[in-house]
Amino acid sequence: MKKINATTPLPYTFEPERMNAKYSMNDGKTWMNHGEFCERMAKAILGYAPTKDAVAFDMGYDLPELKASIKSRKCGLTERHDMPKTPAEFMANFWEREHAELYIYAIDHGDEFNLYMMNRTEFRQFVEHFAKWDAHCVKFRINVCDTKTERWLEDRLGE
């Protein structure tokens, strides 16, 4: 795992009161969720562009879709009828479909931005550590608060 600390290179506004918390690029038009924002930041900071081999991801909302990172590659579970009935079924299906080699998770500290780059094994450990099955809405969610997530990631930087 690798960490890059950088100043946020793009002008944006965070509006947590919007559904699922949205970011705007301050043009009044471009709204995005956290994962899409992570992708833009990663591209601006690293010169990174999403490919089948590298992906920025958002774990704050619905893991079945990993919407921000995987929707364009059609690797995630995106249809309601495709939803698994058990956590084990979901995980087996997810890992069968997800084949990227580099995963980027971003934590925003206002003007500072930490990018955590993980390989497939580290990403899998991250997902399995924070995943929570919500039987009421038949969804996997990542039970994440940035402080807890960052502490977990920081602990693994030295490994």
Residue ranges with predicted function:
Residues 1-159:
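Nucleic-acid endonuclease domains
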